[in-house]
Amino acid sequence: MASIPATVATVAQANMVAPFTGLKANAAFPVTKKVNDFSTLPSNGGRVQCMKVWPPLGKKKYETLSYLPDLTEVQLAKEVDYLLRNKWVPCLEFELEHGFVYRENARSPGYYDGRYWTMWKLPMFGCTDSAQVMKELQECKKEYPQAWIRIIGFDNVRQVQCISFIASKPGGF
């Protein structure tokens, strides 16, 4: 006589989960529980209604901060102070014909747009005061009043340009 194994069907319960049998969760990584209090988080919800979108048609793109109104002398000095605090070397460059983005020497898309600007004098190695940079900016504006002038900051350790912004534009731009 052959024996046939009996199978017993049980109903699976969806809410039953096997217990965790490994390491204790808090044994290696102590965790402090924090209360989720969202009342102290910053919010600009009230200001969103008054924001505007920069119109993309008919507007020339320059460098960093070019979407803003022209920077005042005080604002430019603060940007230069930031550059100097980061131990970057200030340098002035100017362009007489094309201060805006266009492609001449490179056709590939991306950050590099193929423009070459003329350096005003030499990079200001050892500069510690924004007034020195502002004096050079005034000299460059006097020599080339119809030029785009930008201030750039080089990191001479990493050998990269870290900041670049338009300091002066010709009239009508």
From Swiss-Prot:
Compartments where located: Plastid, Chloroplast
Major location (coarse): plastid
Protein's name in the database: Ribulose bisphosphate carboxylase small subunit, chloroplastic 1
Signal sequence interval, chain numbering: none
Organism: Flaveria pringlei
Described function: RuBisCO catalyzes two reactions: the carboxylation of D-ribulose 1,5-bisphosphate, the primary event in carbon dioxide fixation, as well as the oxidative fragmentation of the pentose substrate. Both reactions occur simultaneously and in competition at the same active site. Although the small subunit is not catalytic it is essential for maximal activity.
Keyword Plastid in record: yes
InterPro entries: RuBisCO_ssu (IPR024681), RuBisCO_ssu_dom (IPR000894), RuBisCO_ssu_N (IPR024680), RuBisCO_ssu_sf (IPR036385)
Keyword Acetylation assigned: no
A GO BP annotation: photorespiration
GO MF annotation terms: ribulose-bisphosphate carboxylase activity
Additional remarks: The basic functional RuBisCO is composed of a large chain homodimer in a 'head-to-tail' conformation. In form I RuBisCO this homodimer is arranged in a barrel-like tetramer with the small subunits forming a tetrameric 'cap' on each end of the 'barrel'.
Subunit details: Heterohexadecamer of 8 large and 8 small subunits.
Residue range covered by the transit peptide: 1-49
Annotated Pfam families: RbcS, RuBisCO_small
Family label: Belongs to the RuBisCO small chain family.
Keywords: Calvin cycle, Carbon dioxide fixation, Chloroplast, Photorespiration, Photosynthesis, Plastid, Transit peptide
CC annotations in GO: chloroplast
